[in-house]
Structure formats: structure tokens, C-alpha cells
């Protein structure tokens, strides 16, 4: 089981990203627009740098919904391989059966 603080920090980052997404996208569009003067683009760059770092989408870590584990994460199922195996063996995940041949 992952530390509760790490899971909560990641949740807080997700909300920050959601709140800052439109503002960051607007500033990035200004920065990338070659038609605008360099001074205006530089000011937008400074504003973007002053926004909270946790507002960046790359700061989010995919974590298992069951255990909070950050590694070996299956995006489709939103859980780690260990939680998938445990729940699959119990028959809690539809369509997952232990293979035998």
C-alpha cells in the first residue's frame, strides 16, 4: 500500500492541473505564436513560469486505484499488476480468468 500522503499529493496535483489548464494553454499559444512581437511572447513566458509547477500535466503520476502503487500500472484498468492479479484470482474483474493449458 502506498503512502497516503503521496496519493493525496497526486490528487491535489490533478485538481491543480484541471484548474490551471485553460490559463496554461492560453499562455503557451501566445508563446508559440511567431506572428506576435518577441516582448509579448517573453511576458507570456514569464507569466507561465510564475504559475504553480503542480499545474503542469507532466507532474501527475498514474497510480493504482486499489493500492496507490505508482509502478506497473495498466491504464485501461486503472490498477497495478499486483492488484489486478489479486482481484482477478478472486473473480472481481470481469473477463479476467487464470490461464491454463
Curated annotation (Swiss-Prot):
* UniProt cross-references to Pfam families, sorted A to Z: Ribosomal_S14
What would be an example GO MF term here?
Answer: structural constituent of ribosome
**Where does the signal peptide begin and end?**
none
The alphabetical list of record keywords is:
Ribonucleoprotein, Ribosomal protein, RNA-binding, rRNA-binding
Q: Listed disulfide bonds for this chain?
A: none
Q: Which GO BP annotation is one of this protein's?
A: translation
Give a GO cellular-component term.
cytoplasm
What this chain does, per the record?
Binds 16S rRNA, required for the assembly of 30S particles and may also be responsible for determining the conformation of the 16S rRNA at the A site.
What do we know about how this protein assembles, alone or with others?
A: Part of the 30S ribosomal subunit. Contacts proteins S3 and S10.
- Family stated for the protein in its record: Belongs to the universal ribosomal protein uS14 family.
Q: Spell out the protein name for this chain.
A: Small ribosomal subunit protein uS14
What would be the name of the gene that encodes this protein?
rpsN
